[in-house]
Amino acid sequence: MKYKKEREEMILQYSSSGIYDYEYFRDIPDEKNATPGKAMYLYMFRKNSANINSSLSQIFSATILNLALKGVLTFEMVNDKEVRIYISSGSAEKLNTLERDEKLVYELISKAIWGKGYTTTKEFSRFASREYDLVYSKLNRIDNTVEDILEETGKISRDKKAVAKKWSKKQIGYFTGAFMIFMFMPYIPAITIGLVLLGISARKNAVCFSILTDEGEDEAAQWKGLKKYMEDYSLLNEKQVPDIVLWEKYLVYATAFGISDKVIRQLKMVHPEMFEARDDYNRYTYWNMVSSPRFNSNMFNDFSRDLGRVYDRARNAYSAAHSSSSSGSGGGGGFSGGSSGGGGGGGGSCGGR
């Protein structure tokens, strides 16, 4: 028992160090296994959690771009307003290489495309409005799916997670006990105050340390460094003409982070030659959407935003349907709609990380 307590105290102490930091990071972290969902989870991670549901529109859009880079989907630019999305021929063999969060998105696209052979963002939005339960519930599994993957791959510590859960349960117990005593035995306030103080202490222990392993902390810092690199690109005075294949990958994560507009503007300022007409668009996955003079200059951003609205449509329809049913039964408020970005992890009471 004594050993177990000492081990928990060691985990709490060790987990508050926050030893990793990168001003800029130029590679895709853990590129072979990276997905927009995992990137956003680690980027948004605060203390002991990361609620990415508030960013599902961006994650959904970025995942579709990434599936195209992996050869699972194909885009066809019909005109300035319409992009068709196809399942690529031979994609069945590639499905086993996808991460589970990517498969959730792929399954939705397969259903939206079924029977016609392709879909567009408008058709996909109509599908999401009809099948809102399916779309909303499947995409809201991304958060837990990503967390499970990160735990399985050693980036979230099972030990730290268990300690955090234990302190969360204690916190609930202390506050519940304080409330019950206040209600039924108000003449002994000392016990109520003591339980409240214990609850506050338990909450601090639950939220004020990171459940990430060293590897997870390092990768989280790398994602922050990559985002900053993309945001500050025009300030870095990099002379070499960028590799378009690499920047297509960057744009996946710029889309997930919600900064693709800014990144493209900076590229145009520093390397306008990347946006001139070229004969080799077929070498790339979607660079013609970014730079081809045949299409409007905002086509890529319009396309990625329209993809994000697919999830928004499903969420709004789900909210309306479930709010009306819960209000009819007097339950109210059955839908949380997605939390504030990044799960603040206990706010200012934790101090710096």
Regions found by a protein language model. Give the residues of each.
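A generic alpha-helix propensity feature with a strong bias for hydrophobic helices
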Residues: K32, P189-T192, F275
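Short, structured secondary-structure boundary patches
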Residues: E93-D101, I181-F182, E276, R283-W287
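Compositionally biased, intrinsically disordered low-complexity regions enriched in proline and serine
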Residues: K4, S15, D21-F25, M44, ...
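Alpha-helical transmembrane spans
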Residues: M1, V163-L212, N301
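Short, amphipathic alpha-helical interface elements at domain boundaries
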Residues: M1-K170, A206-L246
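Short hydrophobic helical membrane-anchoring segments positioned at the boundary
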Residues: M10-D30, D133-R141, T145-K166, I200-R353
